[in-house]
Amino acid sequence: MAVSHLPTMVQESVTFKDVAILFTQEEWGQLSPAQRALYRDVMLENYSNLVSLGLLGPKPDTFSQLEKREVWMPEDTPGGFCLDWMTMPASKKSTVKAEIPEEELDQWTIKERFSSSSHWKCASLLEWQCGGQEISLQRVVLTHPNTPSQECDESGSTMSSSLHSDQSQGFQPSKNAFECSECGKVFSKSSTLNKHQKIHNEKNANQKIHIKEKRYECRECGKAFHQSTHLIHHQRIHTGEKPYECKECGKAFSVSSSLTYHQKIHTGEKPFECNLCGKAFIRNIHLAHHHRIHTGEKPFKCNICEKAFVCRAHLTKHQNIHSGEKPYKCNECGKAFNQSTSFLQHQRIHTGEKPFECNECGKAFRVNSSLTEHQRIHTGEKPYKCNECGKAFRDNSSFARHRKIHTGEKPYRCGLCEKAFRDQSALAQHQRIHTGEKPYTCNICEKAFSDHSALTQHKRIHTREKPYKCKICEKAFIRSTHLTQHQRIHTGEKPYKCNKCGKAFNQTANLIQHQRHHIGEK
């Protein structure tokens, strides 16, 4: 916040708000003694810098109080307040020497500030002489654009709005001007603007650390937020409130941005297209993340284990593994989750909601990724290909499991029998052999199963559903593995080879049966 050199000071010295941090009474009460001391030091430093440049009138009572370390609270008026001593008197004109960076010598800025409680505005007109180090500051009074003429309360003088255009005509920036969105400062080069903006970034970071505390805390899970609106959105996770409803399908959302995103599913709009592979996305941020697949960029790194990620959301999810934090708890079964999305997906188990429906066969799913994987059954798409053996897979999880066949990796070991598995779900399924647990029950015949996939396959006996169809002979199957085995009849593929005699088979069961002959020969 401190004024570092004159050009920045002139732009930021028209109203109190431009050089001060303002607090409401409630916000002031939330600050710790250390934060109030920081506030006082920053304000006094700003005032001292402005005094040294000769741009201020008599010292206001406010700063006398601050110097004496008296408790002070800014006035809380609807339109804010403007201090007369912060600007030059209309009759006075001064020339001030200043040290100006070389790259800024050919720049000038006109900056206007408005008082929200009045119809007139005051502007500081800054004339920056090219190649020199002299600055002329003149106070001018202009009328509100919506009124033909209005008297300024400070000087009593009246001007038409045309005066502004007349006086500022000679000060138009070049076509290649780059303006800072934070303070309005103009630069002739984008590289200079980027350097300048780092000052704001550092200031904003410091303000967040010292002043902008996360004051809005959720009573349910203790998570804190900078803004009350963010807390309100977060609390809807706990309450289940979804005030934004889609008129097309009736689906409801907790935030309006999610509804806007969802509506593009109905329209089919995907305006953001990858220029490398042509893949299109609903959101620009998704395209940015996708681009990193091509570039290999992973800018978000875990400071504990150094693992890197394509997007911040994946890093946040990963960091919860280290912290063990699971703030989202299901009121139905007590299960807790480290992500709100996982929590919402879990709740659909209890509600039975399956909002993602296949337009080919009508099958519905709880999560969109399951629908995407399912649709590949119809399209035959297998985007995940193994570099070792050339085998392709419909989903990434199956591909990841397959790769462990080549590496021999089995990191998940049973604590009861020491048997090892390639993935955690296989271990969980195996452990149910020891416990006898069968948590998945058929709602038609009440037969129970130890894993969900077995229940899904069983239900097809009742429904007679055969979703896996051969494209060559149209024969259909209940299981995808049965279709894969059947297709080898057409292709002649025999991937299972006997290591004793070299004979090959199209099914593992046939290979096992064959190997028994070798054992019998011995």
Swiss-Prot record:
Family the UniProt entry places it in: Belongs to the krueppel C2H2-type zinc-finger protein family.
GO BP: regulation of transcription by RNA polymerase II
Keyword Protein transport: no
Keyword Zinc applies: yes
Cystine crosslinks: none
Organism whose genome encodes this protein: Homo sapiens
PROSITE patterns the UniProt entry points to: KRAB, ZINC_FINGER_C2H2_1, ZINC_FINGER_C2H2_2
Name of the protein described by the UniProt record: Zinc finger protein 454
Record-level Gene Ontology MF annotations: DNA-binding transcription factor activity, RNA polymerase II-specific; RNA polymerase II cis-regulatory region sequence-specific DNA binding; sequence-specific double-stranded DNA binding; zinc ion binding
